[in-house]
Each structure stands twice: as C-alpha cells, then as structure tokens.
UniProtKB/Swiss-Prot annotation:
InterPro entries: TatA/B/E, TatA/E. Keywords: Cell inner membrane, Cell membrane, Membrane, Protein transport, Translocation, Transmembrane, Transmembrane helix, Transport. Belongs to the TatA/E family. Residues 69-84 have a biased composition (Basic and acidic residues). PANTHER family: SEC-INDEPENDENT PROTEIN TRANSLOCASE PROTEIN TATA. GO terms for molecular function: protein transmembrane transporter activity. This is Sec-independent protein translocase protein TatA. It comes from Polaromonas naphthalenivorans (strain CJ2). It is found in: Cell inner membrane. Part of the twin-arginine translocation (Tat) system that transports large folded proteins containing a characteristic twin-arginine motif in their signal peptide across membranes. TatA could form the protein-conducting channel of the Tat system. One of its GO terms (biological process) is protein transport by the Tat complex.
Length: 84
C-alpha cells in the first residue's frame, strides 16, 4: 500500500533513461566513481602520521618596512598633479 513495488521503480528507471539517455547516465556514473575514488584516496593520504611528511617551509615573509616602501612607491600625489 504505502511502499513502491518493483513496477513503480521500473517505470521511474525507464523515464530517467528516456530523459537523459544511456550515454549521459554512463558519463555521470563514471564521474561519480572517480569522485568516490578520489575521496577514498584523500582519506587514505590524510591518515598518514605527521612524522612521515616533510616540514613545510614558509615563503619569505614581507616585513612592515617592505610593505610601507611598496605602498609609498604606488601612492600618487594628487596635489602634485594639480600644481603642474
């Protein structure tokens, strides 16, 4: 009564195949399989101990003096333009 019979599911499957086509469904299936495989590989790689990994060396840090010097070079003096 409240559940779906096998005939209901077969009709739904037939409609889905007619709407999307077999090629589109095959592509979606392979994409989904690749995503699941990538997820499993990521979970497997994430479980490695930190001792096995190489330490991350931070990129060169910009000091406040370097940032101020760069900002000063990029600043345009509006009053100097008006005086000329």
């Amino acid at each position: 009564m409240g559940g779906f019979s096998i005939w209901h599911w077969l009709i739904v499957l037939l409609i889905v195949v007619m709407v999307f086509g077999t090629k589109k469904l095959r592509n979606m299936g392979s994409d989904l399989g690749g995503a699941v495989k990538g997820f499993k590989d990521g979970m497997k790689d994430g479980g490695q101990s930190p001792a096995d990994e190489k330490p991350v060396v931070p990129a060169s840090q910009v000091t406040n003096a370097q940032a101020a010097d760069k900002a000063e070079r990029n600043t345009i003096d509006v009053e100097a333009r008006q005086k000329s």
